């Protein structure tokens, strides 16, 4: 039986794409994933993940990567969970070899609902089991998570070469916040790599606009 695993990387950052990856492995090869060191991607260094990438794709019968741009994230019609359902289904439907059973890392607080929503969008029959922290429980999901993280890391490195070092891209990162503030002050807008709908990004924009408006008013009233 063919087993599928699916996960994403980059849901939370204010900068860069969301990457969804799915992997299909024959059930007899699941042990091979464990043997090469596939586990929760968060427990692996970027170098270790990169080394595992080609080994995973060699063991896999099929895999698919979907990259979702910041612009598409900002222009989504629904929630981030709904966008993930849509992109998980897109990745699974794009597979040449269809799995009969799919393990998914649940984005929704209701894991069963998340599974059901994806299952309804499949163009083939498969059973989906969605669980929280599935990437730490199932090697096939760990494998998908590793692929997603490696591709996202590569995308981020490309962006840093073009836009400079913006840190991790997460809103909580002081380096990222400083980069966002400095970029907006200089250009009066954010580049297309930034998720403009993120609260941190909106607050930075509003704060800088308010300060500029105040300076304009101050100059006006200081006129002789």
UniProtKB/Swiss-Prot annotation:
Required cofactor(s): Mn(2+); Mg(2+)
The reaction(s) this protein catalyses: Endonucleolytic cleavage to 5'-phosphomonoester
Enzyme class: hydrolase
Domain RNase H type-2 stretches: 1-210
Cofactor: record remark: Manganese or magnesium. Binds 1 divalent metal ion per monomer in the absence of substrate. May bind a second metal ion after substrate binding.
EC number: 3.1.26.4
GO BP: any one term: mismatch repair
Cellular component GO terms, alphabetical: cytoplasm; ribonuclease H2 complex
Domain of life of the organism encoding this protein: Archaea
Residue positions binding a divalent metal cation: 7-8, 105
Subcellular location: Cytoplasm
Nuclease recorded as keyword: yes
CDD domains, sorted: RNase_HII_archaea_like (cd07180)
Keywords of the record: Cytoplasm, Endonuclease, Hydrolase, Manganese, Metal-binding, Nuclease
Listed InterPro entries: RNase_H2_suA (IPR004649), RNase_HII/HIII (IPR001352), RNase_HII/HIII_dom (IPR024567), RNase_HII_arc (IPR020787), RNaseH-like_sf (IPR012337), RNaseH_sf (IPR036397)
Recorded family membership: Belongs to the RNase HII family.
Function recorded in the entry: Endonuclease that specifically degrades the RNA of RNA-DNA hybrids.
Protein name: Ribonuclease HII
Source organism of this protein record: Pyrococcus furiosus (strain ATCC 43587 / DSM 3638 / JCM 8422 / Vc1)
């Amino acid at each position: 039986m063919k087993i599928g695993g699916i996960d994403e990387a980059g849901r939370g950052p204010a900068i860069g794409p969301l990457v969804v990856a799915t992997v299909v492995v024959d059930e007899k090869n699941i042990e091979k994933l464990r043997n090469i060191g596939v586990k929760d991607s968060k427990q692996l260094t970027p170098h270790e993940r990169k080394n595992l990438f080609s080994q995973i794709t060699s063991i896999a019968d099929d895999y698919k990567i979907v990259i979702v741009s910041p612009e598409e994230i900002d222009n989504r019609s629904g929630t981030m969970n709904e966008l993930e359902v849509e992109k998980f289904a897109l990745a699974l439907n794009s597979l040449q070899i269809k799995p009969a059973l799919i393990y998914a890392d649940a984005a929704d607080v209701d894991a069963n609902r998340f599974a059901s929503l994806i299952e309804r969008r499949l163009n083939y029959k498969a059973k989906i089991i969605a669980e929280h922290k599935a990437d730490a429980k199932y090697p096939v999901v760990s494998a998908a998570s590793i692929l997603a993280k490696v591709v996202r890391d590569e995308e981020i490195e490309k962006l840093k070469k073009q836009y400079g070092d913006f840190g991790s891209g997460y809103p909580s990162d002081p380096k990222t916040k400083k980069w966002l503030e400095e970029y907006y002050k200089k250009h009066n807008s954010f580049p297309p790599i930034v998720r403009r709908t993120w609260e941190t990004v909106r607050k930075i924009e509003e704060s800088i606009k308010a300060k500029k408006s105040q300076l304009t008013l101050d100059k006006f009233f200081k006129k002789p």
